[in-house]
Regions:
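Short coil/turn connectors at secondary-structure junctions
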Residues: 1, 57-59, 80-81, 99-101
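C-terminal binding/interaction regions
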Residues: 4-6, 10-11, 89-143
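Glycine-rich phosphate/diphosphate-binding loop of Rossmann-like nucleotide-binding domains
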Residues: 5-23
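A short beta-strand-loop structural module common to alpha/beta enzyme folds
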Residues: 28-39
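Short, structured active-site "lid" loops
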Residues: 45-63, 67
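Compact, glycine-rich, soluble single-domain proteins
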Residues: 56, 64-81
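Short hydrophobic/aromatic-enriched beta-strand-loop microsegments
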Residues: 81-88
Length: 143
């Protein structure tokens, strides 16, 4: 599975921890930036990710900002993107199973590293159910 990761300055530290953690697990996360804690604009980071997802350069992505809110709003303004803030195990599973989310979002200043890893592991290993009702609803999102 080809996975991208990106963060603004508020999520930079968490992004670096995740890259290191998953590298040790044999899971490669392609870093789309930012590359420092210097202030940057989360919409630009989100758009870099959404462009790559829509071009099918990656199967899924991780976006991180301080709260997860701003970067998720920016990503979800793009047709074809379904970015979900993951905050518990059930949400991590259902957002893939029912919504076929293609980007997991986290609040780097709001969530613990252990929780982020737990939720992303569920997200990345859960398949979309492909049930008609879910396909229909996803189709309605992109009208």
């Amino acid at each position: 599975m080809n996975i991208a990761i990106a963060a603004d300055h508020g999520g930079f530290e968490m992004k670096q921890k995740l890259i290191n953690h998953y590298e040790k697990q044999g899971v490669s996360l392609v870093d789309l930036g930012t590359h420092s804690e210097e202030s940057c604009d989360y919409p630009k980071i989100a758009h870099k990710m959404t462009d790559a997802i829509l071009k099918k350069e990656f199967d899924m992505g991780i976006l991180i900002c301080g709260t997860g809110i701003g970067i998720s709003i920016a990503a979800n303004r793009v047709k074809g993107i379904r970015a979900a803030i993951l905050y518990n195990e059930q949400v991590a599973r259902l957002t893939r199973e029912h919504n076929d989310a293609n980007i997991a979002v986290f609040g780097g200043r709001m969530q613990s590293f252990d929780d982020v890893v737990k939720y992303f592991d569920i997200f990345r290993t859960t398949k979309f159910s492909e049930e008609n009702r879910h396909c229909r609803r996803i189709g309605e999102l992109d009208r």
